[in-house]
């Protein structure tokens, strides 16, 4: 009898082969080695192939009900980046020299309402559910948001969306580390001022999206502090 726990999946339509490409020790070592870069070497660039893999890691990330409420904006325009800097205290010394700068956006409340054009598109065009199943699917969405998670205000619902965006961010950070590329997630910015600048510059439509977080990718040009984390005993509780 096979000891491969994923063998039973290989013949199921639509289910990928889950053969591991890294062992547990390799993955743990990767996570131990990953760190947030504080300064970048402006002469070293991430290849387009590697950047595409990072974006693919974000695209393939899980999301609640499979709604994928994110959008990624790659900002190449250096003039715009310079305009952004006064509003991004957490990006000083990073944004200027990083190879790639990405804004991660979340979809606004109206986009995430049952029967919105976006959720209908996800249901029918992306997830390939039949149109007849739309009512049941949207009804489940209402129950999930309003009752199961008791999300009543627009702010609460936007925060729920942002949680999904952070799942994509986490996968992008791990993918970049797996390829030896440094990264910096950035929350240190003046949200309202930066949203005003980006929407005025036509970076995104504020009726559709809101700004969630930034991330930079490149190659570090500085030493970094030793990584510190709490021990497992402080972060894990086991209930038998």
Q: Which residues are covered by each model-predicted region?
A:
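Acidic, surface-exposed loops and disordered segments
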Residues: 1-240
């Amino acid at each position: 009898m096979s000891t491969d726990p994923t063998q039973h999946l290989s013949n199921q339509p639509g289910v990928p082969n889950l053969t591991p490409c890294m062992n547990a020790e390799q993955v743990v070592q990767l996570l131990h080695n990953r760190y947030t870069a504080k300064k970048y070497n402006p002469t070293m660039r991430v290849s387009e192939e590697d950047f595409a893999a990072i974006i693919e890691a974000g695209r393939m990330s899980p999301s609640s009900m499979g709604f994928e409420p994110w959008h990624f904006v790659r900002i190449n325009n250096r003039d715009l980046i310079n305009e952004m800097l006064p509003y991004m205290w957490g990006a000083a010394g990073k944004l200027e020299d990083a190879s790639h700068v990405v804004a991660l956006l979340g979809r606004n409340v109206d986009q995430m309402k049952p029967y919105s054009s976006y959720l209908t598109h996800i249901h029918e065009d992306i997830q390939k559910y039949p149109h007849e199943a739309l009512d049941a699917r949207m009804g489940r969405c209402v129950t999930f948001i309003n009752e199961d998670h008791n999300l009543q205000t627009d702010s609460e619902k936007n925060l729920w969306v942002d949680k999904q965006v952070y799942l994509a961010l986490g996968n992008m950070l791990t993918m970049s580390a797996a390829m030896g590329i440094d990264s910096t997630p950035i929350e240190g910015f003046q949200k309202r001022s930066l949203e005003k600048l980006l929407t005025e510059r036509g970076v995104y439509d504020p009726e559709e999206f809101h700004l969630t977080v930034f991330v930079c990718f490149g190659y570090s040009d500085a030493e970094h502090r030793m990584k510190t984390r709490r021990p497992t005993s402080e972060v894990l509780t086991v209930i038998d």
